[in-house]
Structures are given as C-alpha cells and as structure tokens.
C-alpha cells in the first residue's frame, strides 16, 4: 500500500533541500541526485514507493518544488546547503509577498528579510500562498508587500524558483511595506 503523497513529498523536500547525505545521496553542484537513488532512499522509510509515484508527486506539485531532468531530480528552491541554481530571472513582477509571524515584524522592518538558514529569501506571487506559508511558523501572521522594482534598483535579482515562488538574496527594509 502506498503512503500518502503528502508524506512522501515532505520527506523528498527534507532529503533534497537539507539532508541528502543522511540518506547516502551526493548532490551535484546544481543539487541534482539520481532519481533511482532518491527512490531507494525514500524506500528506507516508505518501502512501497516507486519511481512512478515520485514522478507523479513532481507532476502534481502545485508549488513546483521539484524538477526532473532525465534520470535526475532536485528541489528547485529551499536548500540549506550551497547549490548553483540556473533559474530564470523574473523581470516582470511588480509586487511580491511574504507572510511572517507578527513577532518578527519589528526586526524585519528594521533589518529587512534575510535568508536565515537557507540560500535565499522566499517570496510569493500570491498573497494567499504567502499567508499560508507564514502560518507554518505561527498563527498571527502579517503580510509583507515587497516592491520588486525596488529590489531591482538595488541590484538584487529576483528568480523564478517555482510556479508562484520567487527567490532573492535578501530584501532591504526600504523595499518592504506592511499590508494593512
């Protein structure tokens, strides 16, 4: 019997973004690992997982978290270890969004958004997705509006990392306003 798609996807994200070595995987510089090796790693927790099931997870993922190229797979964003990503630059978005617990607001408005334990700051093209993401870290969430033109004027490139996900090195406080 197959485990739930969501449970396997969460494990895939953990392995590909944070801990490939824990499962005996060695990503290349772009974060790719052999798909067959990921399937074997997943089987240590979920023995019934197949390559077809993993491909289905990737195809149905609404956020575009994963990418398969030939017989290799990677997470498209969210890595806590260095990877060289070749994402297309987003030169069109005017505003992007970031949901965060209210307790973080004062420091963000003072210091800006930083990648923390990741390589990039994650932003969304969707207000609702940003709020949903922020709720993973606390219930009382505020919505930050990021002026993408302000980022570009400061020499910061915004990249398309997923369907509605954008990544940037950092977000200076002067590019942030609070959605009221």
Curated annotation (Swiss-Prot):
A Gene Ontology BP annotation from the UniProt entry: tRNA splicing, via endonucleolytic cleavage and ligation
Function in brief: Removes the 2'-phosphate from RNA via an intermediate in which the phosphate is ADP-ribosylated by NAD followed by a presumed transesterification to release the RNA and generate ADP-ribose 1''-2''-cyclic phosphate (APPR>P). May function as an ADP-ribosylase.
Protein name: Probable RNA 2'-phosphotransferase
UniProt xrefs under HAMAP family: KptA (MF_00299)
Gene3D superfamilies named in the record: 3.20.170.30, RNA 2'-phosphotransferase, Tpt1/KptA family, N-terminal domain
Enzyme Commission numbers on file: 2.7.1.-
Record carries keyword Transferase: yes
Protein family according to the UniProt entry: Belongs to the KptA/TPT1 family.
Organism, scientific name: Thermococcus onnurineus (strain NA1)
Lineage top rank: taxon: Archaea
InterPro entries assigned to the protein according to its UniProt record, in alphabetical order: Ptrans_KptA/Tpt1, RNA_2'-PTrans_C, RNA_2'-PTrans_KptA, RNA_2'-PTrans_N
GO-annotated molecular function: NAD+ poly-ADP-ribosyltransferase activity; tRNA 2'-phosphotransferase activity
Keyword entries, A-Z: NAD, Transferase
